[in-house]
């Protein structure tokens, strides 16, 4: 079953595909992606469109997508409000819990050498990291580093302004 990765114009989307070791990927973005043989692409509305959630769900159902990996913070926040709807259709949003998002309001966009993908607290791809108990029930894509002997982590996101 295919997965959907947003921010399809970004190098982070293709890096995530490599980390996931999946070949059946649909890359989605707000702009038309270049036609690359063997790569499935999709144009989606911007996060602030009234039809964003509806179009994302429709795309998932049309393409039999089982997991969505949003790489833009605004998409994460919009999709978090529709978590139950996607769940009804057995589409997993690979984003942290509402509680985690609420308590991590200073989410920074940064690129890290270390990326881990978690599903309900279990590592499914990426680089193992210390202190898993900090994210023991979370899903999503996280970047992490040890800076001055302190473990730091954040969501793995793209910088919208850079695109």
Residue ranges and their predicted role:
Residues 102-146:
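Short, glycine-/small-residue-rich phosphate/pyrophosphate-handling segment
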Residues 89-105:
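Short, acidic/small-residue loops that bind anionic groups at enzyme active sites
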Residues 1-91, 130-163:
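ATP-binding N-terminal substructure of ATP-dependent carboxylate-amine bond-forming enzymes
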């Amino acid at each position: 079953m295919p997965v959907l990765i947003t921010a399809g114009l970004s190098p982070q989307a293709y890096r995530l595909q490599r980390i996931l070791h999946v070949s059946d990927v649909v890359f989605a973005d707000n702009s038309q992606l270049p036609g690359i043989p063997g790569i499935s692409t999709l144009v989606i509305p911007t996060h602030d469109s009234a039809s964003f959630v509806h179009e994302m769900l429709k795309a998932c159902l049309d393409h039999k997508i089982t997991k969505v990996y949003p790489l833009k913070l605004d998409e994460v926040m919009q999709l978090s409000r529709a978590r139950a709807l996607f769940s009804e259709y057995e589409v997993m949003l690979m984003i942290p819990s509402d509680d985690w998002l609420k308590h991590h309001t200073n989410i920074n966009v940064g690129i890290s050498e270390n990326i881990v993908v978690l599903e309900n607290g279990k590592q499914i791809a990426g680089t193992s990291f210390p202190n898993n108990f900090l994210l023991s029930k979370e899903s999503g894509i996280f970047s992490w580093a040890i800076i001055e002997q302190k473990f730091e982590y954040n969501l793995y996101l793209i910088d919208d302004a850079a695109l």
